[in-house]
Amino acid sequence: MEANIIKRIILESLITPPRWGSKHTEIRNIKKGFPLHISSSKEGQKLIDKLIKVLINDGWLLCKKSTGELHVSLNPHMKKEIMKFLK
């Protein structure tokens, strides 16, 4: 599966319901939204984890350690770029 499609699924799963700024969710909740043929394979899981890290490093996702788990949310300062990517 192409990386841009997986990035789109990650971002869309955080847009609805809205997870901008201080409203965040666990990474495992994002992984639940993927088709089974991707999320059940080790290669698919590694690719999802890699692309989440890429989005964090690009500044599109904010990360926070909460309740012992890593939580992420969309960066509200990058909203224009995120919405442009999704169109």
Language-model region placement:
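Short coil/turn segments at secondary-structure boundaries
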Residues: 24-26, 66
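Short helix-coil junctions and helix-kink-helix linkers
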Residues: 28-45
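Short, hydrophobic-biased segments on the C-terminal half of alpha helices
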Residues: 45-53
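A short, conserved structural fragment
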Residues: 53-66
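Minor-groove-contacting beta-hairpin "wing" of winged helix-turn-helix DNA-binding domains
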Residues: 68-74
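Short alpha-helical segments that sit at the start of domains
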Residues: 1-22
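Short, amphipathic alpha-helical interaction segments positioned at domain boundaries
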Residues: 77-87
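Acidic, low-complexity, intrinsically disordered interaction modules
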Residues: 39-41, 49, 65
